[in-house]
Amino acid sequence: TFLTVIAAHAANKTLYAGKLKFDPVTSFAPVSLVGIAPIMILVSNDLPVKTVGELIAYAKQNPGKISFGSSGVGAAAHLTSELIMQVTGTRMVHVPYKGTAPALADLMSGNIQMLLDVPIGTMSQVKAGKVRALAMMSKERVPGAEDIPTIVESGGPLIESSSWVMFMAPAGTPKEIVDRIGDEVAKAM
């Protein structure tokens, strides 16, 4: 039996300390990284900002007035939003959702003002003009989304953040099996 995990898996040990019946780190062995994508900063069309620099300035002038959604407590987007607030000295309100779809719907309707997520689930709404992408949280522009600036180009601090998907095996799975499955996944990708 193998498990597919996302980046939030890495935070579970800390977020749910003492509440889990297993150790998210030591109970599994990594098999293969399947994919990785940078986090994108999205805002509602109603928010009067066009860059990350303007977003930071607006958040400082309006502490607690910007609400940001995430696909759930402990998700990469949630933790990255908290890091942005810590680094920039801003205060925003976290609204956790059960997945990206309801958060994106609320962003489009203006119920929340900001959402961080990977491009695959949100780019169609950006291209349709239903939300604005301020930046990718990467050092370089992202292939296929070259028109979206990096966070630094958009006036923000250099904070890189991404989400990933990984195959994991139960701890104690023989190394030969883990290596072979990892090699086969790499060939398939």
Where does each model-flagged region fall?
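Hinge/capping helix and adjacent helix->loop/strand transition within the periplasmic-binding protein
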Residues: 1, 10-102, 151, 164-189
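Paired acidic/hydrophobic, glycine-rich loop segments that form the ligand-binding mouth/hinge
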Residues: 1-5, 113-117, 133-135
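Short secondary-structure boundary segments
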Residues: 6-7, 45, 118-120, 138-139, ...
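Small-residue (glycine/proline)-centered packing/hinge motifs flanked by hydrophobic/aromatic residues
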Residues: 17-25, 140-159
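Conserved helix-loop-beta element of the AMP-binding
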Residues: 29, 55, 130-143
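Conserved functional loop/turn residues at catalytic and ligand-binding sites
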Residues: 51, 96, 110-111, 130, ...
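Short helices/loops that flank or line small-molecule/ion binding pockets
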Residues: 83-87, 101-111, 120-130
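Flexible glycine-rich beta->alpha loop in the catalytic core of nucleotide-sugar glycosyltransferases
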Residues: 113, 120-121, 139, 157
